[in-house]
């Protein structure tokens, strides 16, 4: 009987260990597809598909000769696989976001930024940031998993075409050095 309980506990710990941590659920973020697999390789894509909320580093540990993408830009997810989810936004528009926090036991910092997809660099200051995420609030309400962002007027024409920019949610768990991202394609009209 005791061995059965220990086995169940070990299996639960194993499943918990491979289950991811956090991913934006609303609005729907970029996801995998054929272009993603062609760019990043089957081994990396398999890891990311098996744990959509897991750290990018888990996938990078499986990178092989097929890997030819930047997994640290939207987990390597490609615009071409996500054209049905492009957001059309206006300057000053407020967008609601919800993060599914699956396991937040590795605190770090997080932010939401507009990122130029050609350089993987933020355009301007973060739209939101948290120095201690996800421990920032015990909530409810929690402004770190349910929050709004406002499309800034400072983007100029850099984000006027779909695919040029993403709204990126970024969490770096500094204790265990793991990176989590969700990206949303958009363009400003």
Label for each model-derived stretch:
Residues 19-189:
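Structured recognition/catalytic domains enriched at protein termini
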